């Protein structure tokens, strides 16, 4: 089961409220500091560099833990890894995603696959299931239903169980008002029902991960 402290931290980033983020960081002081950093580092893909930099600065203040060493990866491996990770997250919708984003702008398509999934989401330090659950928790609070849909489904595609996504949604909804929380839960319920129909047709367990990336 992914560390709930990481999910709470990710969700708090969507509030843009320093008090909420600080409280989540204080709650995460006992978590793996590398994992905490990875949650903060990947957040720049969704909340932008300014908020991510501010969050990293706040973490240094709250934790007094120095930055971990650079991953020192060879960028030449990011393109292939990005395609692999992105196709895992999007499953059968991967080709359609690439076509749609490429139609918006071909450079954005490359930035998404190579930069987003190859450079960031696929990097070491945090497993893909936890990364996707953290992304979903953040996006639920950030209020972007289309992208939230993709990453709730992507969490299942990466190997999260329904119970694990339930937890991420519950944590995120703790930061939301009644109407927003209801909308998030309704979206997740629709995705869960769709996944259940697919699992039933394939003869899988109702709570089995679609594709477990945790080894």
Where are the model-predicted features located?
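Acidic, glycine/proline-rich low-complexity segments that act as flexible tails and inter-domain linkers
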Residues: 1-5, 11-35, 41-128, 157, ...
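Residue-level detector of family-conserved "landmark" positions at structurally sensitive sites
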Residues: 36, 165-166
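A structural feature that tracks compact, well-ordered secondary-structure segments
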Residues: 12, 23-27, 124-125, 135-158, ...
């Amino acid at each position: 089961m992914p560390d709930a402290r990481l999910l709470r931290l990710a969700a708090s980033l969507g509030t843009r409220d320093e008090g909420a983020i600080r409280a989540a960081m204080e709650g995460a002081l006992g978590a793996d500091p590398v994992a905490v950093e990875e949650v903060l580092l990947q957040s720049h893909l969704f909340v932008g560099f300014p908020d991510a930099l501010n969050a990293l600065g706040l973490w240094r203040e709250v934790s007094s833990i120095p930055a971990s060493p650079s991953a020192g990866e060879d960028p030449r491996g990011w393109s292939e890894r990005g395609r692999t990770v992105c196709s895992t997250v999007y499953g059968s919708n991967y080709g359609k995603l690439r076509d749609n984003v490429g139609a918006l702008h071909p450079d954005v398509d490359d930035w998404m696959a190579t930069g987003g999934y190859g450079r960031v989401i696929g990097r070491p330090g945090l497993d893909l299931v936890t990364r996707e659950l953290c992304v979903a928790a953040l996006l639920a609070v950030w209020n972007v239903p289309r992208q939230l849909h993709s990453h709730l489904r992507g969490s299942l595609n990466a190997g999260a169980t329904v119970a694990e996504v339930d937890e991420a949604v519950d944590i995120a909804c703790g930061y939301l008002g009644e109407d927003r929380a209801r909308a998030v839960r309704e979206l997740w319920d629709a995705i869960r029902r769709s996944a259940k129909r697919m699992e039933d047709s394939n003869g899988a367990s109702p709570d089995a991960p679609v594709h477990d990336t945790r080894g």
